[in-house]
């Protein structure tokens, strides 16, 4: 099964935009067609970000809570993350660390360019739309 790291922006945009590529990826995860990797750092970030008034206005707190619970209960929680210092945004380095330690095929982000990088080691960093196209094409 394909192993993915979903950037927080992908996880939060999915429930806010039900017809989006991000929402389609969450549906694949819900249907157990992909494995999602996370870490305590990301769960903490989502918990913090979903308390911001502008996010609460777009994402009902109960829905945010369900997302956090699903990450804790269903995603593969990766521990002992390596130190990574590659992203132009230092706050995104933990996503690359999750991908590295969890042996993800793809970190998926809504950022353009993806996390400011095309690759981390041998892992290609993609947007949700690119990932869906890759899945349609057989993961190549």
Model-inferred region functions:
Residues 1-38:
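Short, well-structured N-terminal submotif of metal-dependent ribonuclease cores
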Residues 89, 102-106, 112-140:
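Acidic, PIN/NYN-like endoribonuclease modules and their adjacent C-terminal/linker elements
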Residues 11-12, 43, 55, 114, ...:
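A generic structural signal for short hydrophobic patches within well-formed alpha-helices
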Residues 73-107, 112:
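Active-site neighborhoods of divalent-metal-dependent phosphate/nucleic-acid chemistry enzymes
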Residues 28, 98, 117:
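Hydrophobic/aromatic ligand-binding patch that stacks against planar heteroaromatic rings
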Residues 8, 40-41, 110-112:
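Short secondary-structure boundary segments
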Residues 21-22, 64, 91-92:
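Amphipathic coiled-coil/heptad-repeat helices and related helical stalk/stem segments
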Residues 28-83:
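PIN-domain endoribonuclease scaffold, especially VapC-family toxins
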């Amino acid at each position: 099964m394909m192993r993915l790291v979903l950037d927080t922006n992908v996880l939060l945009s999915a429930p806010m935009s039900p017809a989006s590529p991000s929402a389609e990826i969450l549906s694949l995860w819900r249907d157990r067609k992909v494995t999602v990797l996370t870490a305590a750092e990301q769960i903490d970030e989502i918990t913090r970000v979903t308390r911001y008034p502008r996010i609460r206005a777009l994402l009902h707190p109960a829905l945010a809570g369900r997302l956090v619970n699903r990450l804790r209960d269903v995603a593969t929680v990766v521990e002992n993350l390596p130190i990574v210092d590659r992203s132009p945004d230092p706050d995104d380095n933990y996503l690359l660390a999750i991908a590295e330690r969890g042996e993800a095929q793809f970190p998926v982000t809504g950022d353009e360019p993806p996390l400011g990088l095309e690759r981390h080691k041998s892992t290609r960093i993609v947007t949700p739309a690119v990932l869906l196209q890759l899945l349609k094409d057989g993961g190549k």
